[in-house]
């Protein structure tokens, strides 16, 4: 039987344990297992925002744009190694929904003559809604499932299932789609900062993701887009904004896209949000994705073992190589449980129809948090 002392022993031996002290945790009695929805705030974030406010905005005023202009690409270069991308292949901008729209539209443009978009019927809602909207506007067909790809222009997939945490074989599925002549847009929102992934090594050409979950970038933090360097000269995204223009200050009559990743941008970036996101991204870079992934696998492994111990059902894969950094607990009263536990300071989240998600954010989640959280669920289930 796993005991609380076992969890405390794992915490004592955790090579990443010191990172938790670098986050603002005003109430240590709160058990937070929802970093897969919103990460905790790093202490450095407030300091960094104060610096940008005082030194750049208040003191530098408009002159600060001299070093703000390329900030989306600079922060993208900090993020790039976390996903196996190269310098100049990632840019932070806008939000995930808009970036999905851009990437899918751009991918369609690279496959003329094809008019089918493939996506899972139970993928994350915003991805499905965007795909449906694009298909409606262009007169395309939406196919739910990936068995037939020979007539597909673009396949849209999440790396990790947002409910069960099942991890897709990105390399194999990318190769299969490319062999059928289809483009692929990968959504890494539940993967970035959680698993050690090599987009270049997997042959991925287009990907998007957020920075407010495992990267701890803050609520509403900017999303990001990855475009493999070999596509930079040919990819055309559908929203032509001045920030993506080759000479943005020429104010010319026509749009000519920039020759690099910045062609995926739109308008003026949110500098304060970028500054906050950079702090969280840099912390993950400092810890290193191999160590983060290893701890995430151990945390979720403990959660699954505790589910077994308490007789709680979970659809999350037991093979650590096939799951992300949350564990789904199924119960008919899941929604009521989450509401009651939240009131007690034990924070999970709920997903329809019957899932309690236990998010394990390796830089902040302790093994004892997992133990106490699952024990609290078990007490409610036993009533």
Where are these regions (language model features)?
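Pyridoxal 5′-phosphate
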Residues: 1-383
